């Protein structure tokens, strides 16, 4: 039977495009995540970037838009996660932070889980699914509302939410992606995450076929 562990082990980083990602922490510190020589490099950015290196255009405006995937499952950016009024307006009780170097702002007000994930195509996003899914399910069991966020709420957090829907609702990648895109139009998981999500679907379809064969034998 083709399991999630097999999917994770079989996934190859070698064919994916390299890139770098900037993260802004709660204190305003800039962190650059890059992949070089088969290693992740995380450095603090001292000088403001003149642009071009990572194809990054700085946007100083706050992104407080929250995508309502389900009444109890929300997707957003670090700006939303750091805005108390936005969190209260959406009745958030749990916050899943999958950014790198982004602090949790209101520790006494919400239940947090932080998992540092680099927004690189080479990052094995599937390996983070089990603990992320468990936290989301825990919030649901407690009749809570969980916000999943990364830095921009575009790639990492979106991939986690898409994967969760594929797993919990046995839906296809296309259907899950469309649902999340409709709720938060800005989502755009990086190329590696997109490939892994498709691989995840293939594994689930293989498992379904195996179960059908077992039941018919």
From Swiss-Prot:
Residues where N-acetylmethionine is found: 1
Active site, UniProt feature: 150
Record-linked CDD domains: DSP_DUSP19
Keyword Hydrolase tagged: yes
Gene Ontology cellular-component terms listed: cytoplasm
Keyword Protein biosynthesis annotated: no
SUPFAM superfamilies xrefs: (Phosphotyrosine protein) phosphatases II
PROSITE patterns reported for this sequence: TYR_PHOSPHATASE_2, TYR_PHOSPHATASE_DUAL
InterPro entries: Dual-sp_phosphatase_cat-dom (IPR000340), Prot-tyrosine_phosphatase-like (IPR029021), Tyr_Pase_dom (IPR000387), TYR_PHOSPHATASE_DUAL_dom (IPR020422)
GO BP term (any one): negative regulation of JNK cascade
Family per record: Belongs to the protein-tyrosine phosphatase family. Non-receptor class dual specificity subfamily.
Described function: Has a dual specificity toward Ser/Thr and Tyr-containing proteins.
Protein name, per record: Dual specificity protein phosphatase 19
Organism, scientific name: Homo sapiens (Human)
Gene this protein is translated from: DUSP19
């Amino acid at each position: 039977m083709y399991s999630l562990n097999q999917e994770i082990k079989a996934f190859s980083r070698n064919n994916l495009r390299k890139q770098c990602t900037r993260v802004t922490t709660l204190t305003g510190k800039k962190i650059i995540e890059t992949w070089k020589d088969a290693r992740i490099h995380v450095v603090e950015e001292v000088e403001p970037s003149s642009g071009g290196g990572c194809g990054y255009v700085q946007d100083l405006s706050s992104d407080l838009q929250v995508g309502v995937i389900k009444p109890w499952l929300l997707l957003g950016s670090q700006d939303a996660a750091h805005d108390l009024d936005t969190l209260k307006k959406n009745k958030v009780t749990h916050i899943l932070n999958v950014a790198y170097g982004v602090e949790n702002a209101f520790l006494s007000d919400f239940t947090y889980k932080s998992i540092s994930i680099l927004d690189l195509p080479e990052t094995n996003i599937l390996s983070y699914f089990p603990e992320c899914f468990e936290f989301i399910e825990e919030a649901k069991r407690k009749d809570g509302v969980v916000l999943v966020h990364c830095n921009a709420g575009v790639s990492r957090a979106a991939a986690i939410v898409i994967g969760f829907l594929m797993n919990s609702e046995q839906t296809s990648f296309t259907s899950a992606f469309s649902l999340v895109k409709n709720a938060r139009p800005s989502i755009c998981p990086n190329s590696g995450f997109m490939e892994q999500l498709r691989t995840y679907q293939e594994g689930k379809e293989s498992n379904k076929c195996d179960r059908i064969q077992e039941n018919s034998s």
